[in-house]
Amino acid sequence: MISDRVKKGLKRAPNRSLLKACGYTDEELERPFIGVVNSFTEVVPGHIHLRDIAEAVKKGIYANGGTAFEFNTMAICDGIAMGHEGMKYSLPSREIIADTVESMAKAHGFDGLVLIPSCDKIVPGMIMGAIRTGLPFIVVTGGPMFPGELRGKKYDLISVFEGVGACAAGKITEEELKEIEDIACPGAGSCAGLFTANTMACLTEAMGLSLPYCATSHATTAEKIRIAKRSGMRIVDLVRNNITPDKILTKEAFENAILVDLALGGSTNTTLHIPAIANEVKPKFITLDDFDRLSGEVPHIASLRPGGEHFIIDLHRAGGIPAVLKVLEEKIRKECLTVSGKTIGEIIKEVKYIDYSVIRPVDNPVHETAGLRILKGSLAPNGAVVKIGAVNPKMYKHEGPARVFDSEEEAVDAILGGDIERGDVVVIRYEGPAGGPGMREMLAPTSAICGMGLDDSVALITDGRFSGGSRGPCIGHVSPEAMAGGPIAIVEDGDIIKIDMINKKLDLALDEEEIKERLAKWKKPEPKVKKGYLARYAKLVSSADEGAVLRYD
């Protein structure tokens, strides 16, 4: 066992003494050492219940003959960080989380890991760090929050964000907004729709890194505790059988995750996180081109929030991710191994129930095209991303004058102030990975646009990114970003922007010579942050089309 390096032999008497100071017995030191990576915190609703899940995991580890060592890493709530400087730290926190998992596992000689993440950046961050260790690992995602209810109608966090815009437009009163605010998030769990956290949980299961039904099993249920306990038992078997990440995370496993993502219409943030996770297996193992290639293989089969009517609880009751895999069976790579010990094909064979009103058959989909689309053109030579499944079909093609803003705050003030007209294309730049720095989510401006009823006539384009809760014609991840001298940096108010989601095009309606002349005159602005973690991050981070990972060179 790897743990022998810290516990075996005469020279390791001091190491054993320190472990005994923690209360571990000689008998416990003989067993496989399993690191239980928790991300409990009292400030993130998706993580406030994770101590209970960790306890269940540890019981499972001991039940199967392992010894559990729990430690923590950080977790940022994107919703609380939204709309202010705090959001600059969200995406960069993914790299810190990866580093902490790698560091703790390597320093203490663990034989395997159980990861307990829940929200947006914590899921990919933990997985990235675990891959670096080369150790067997299993993921127990914290589970979704139930939707809130008021007078027979269901609500979630996005209801509150959009309520702000509706209130600003005079559609609802402040008292009505307060009512929604009070009930929309009723307790523990990741926000109730197919936003980034739940999307990443679904893709983690589709990749084979979680037990079946883990992704959609809700946060505070006994079912989640049982899955956690079984995961603890299962990691000991993975260690004994040396089922390392390379045996599970094949190219085909990543393709399964992307196919599920495209079919469900998941968060656009997956186009950052899946390439970043794959990059830990092999550089450029998965790129935007893979999303583009696979988008032609599956339709959009589930009408889930924010673009649709159903919540994750509906997806779970309809059969969860195994049912989604079953519906996509003809396209899924069924030979892929999972942490359950079964292949994806074997999991598919065990599916007994599918509610086709929620998970639609491929011959009767929600939309004929996949839920995400990669756009390229003179405004985004290296690519941009849109959740087409959450866009009003009237906006699939759109031409309009640019309204240019160099920060999210400026754009939100203009939108809520009534300065944006129907037909406009709002451009928010210098919000990319390096320019922000941190590539903030633009949920406040997109929710304001939707809440004010402009999402059928106003598009938003940014080198920043969007919350998984964003809906409407929101095109993000424009690459190269403005801070890198991409064409988005030279857009001027009134320039016509052409959007064609059907043909995957995003163009600035200027001739090539004009674009070249403007780019030649462009001067890189001073960094917004000059000290601390964000300053270091801005210097090392790669482009959004490369997953916004940190460069080693």
Curated annotation (Swiss-Prot):
PROSITE patterns: ILVD_EDD_1, ILVD_EDD_2. Pfam families: ILV_EDD_C (PF24877), ILVD_EDD_N (PF00920). Its cofactor is [2Fe-2S] cluster; Mg(2+). One of its GO terms (molecular function) is magnesium ion binding. It catalyses: (2R)-2,3-dihydroxy-3-methylbutanoate = 3-methyl-2-oxobutanoate + H2O; (2R,3R)-2,3-dihydroxy-3-methylpentanoate = (S)-3-methyl-2-oxopentanoate + H2O. One of its GO terms (biological process) is isoleucine biosynthetic process. The active site is at S467 (proton acceptor). Pathway: Amino-acid biosynthesis; L-isoleucine biosynthesis; L-isoleucine from 2-oxobutanoate: step 3/4; Amino-acid biosynthesis; L-valine biosynthesis; L-valine from pyruvate: step 3/4. Keywords: 2Fe-2S, Amino-acid biosynthesis, Branched-chain amino acid biosynthesis, Iron, Iron-sulfur, Lyase, Magnesium, Metal-binding. SUPFAM superfamilies: IlvD/EDD N-terminal domain-like (SSF143975), LeuD/IlvD-like (SSF52016). GO terms for cellular component: cytosol. It is an enzyme of class 4 (lyase). Mg(2+) binds at D78, D120, K121, E441. InterPro entries: Dihydro-acid_dehy_C, DihydroxyA_deHydtase, DiOHA_6PGluconate_deHydtase_CS, ILV_EDD_C, ILV_EDD_N, IlvD/EDD_N. Functions in the biosynthesis of branched-chain amino acids. Catalyzes the dehydration of (2R,3R)-2,3-dihydroxy-3-methylpentanoate (2,3-dihydroxy-3-methylvalerate) into 2-oxo-3-methylpentanoate (2-oxo-3-methylvalerate) and of (2R)-2,3-dihydroxy-3-methylbutanoate (2,3-dihydroxyisovalerate) into 2-oxo-3-methylbutanoate (2-oxoisovalerate), the penultimate precursor to L-isoleucine and L-valine, respectively. Belongs to the IlvD/Edd family. Homodimer. This is Dihydroxy-acid dehydratase.
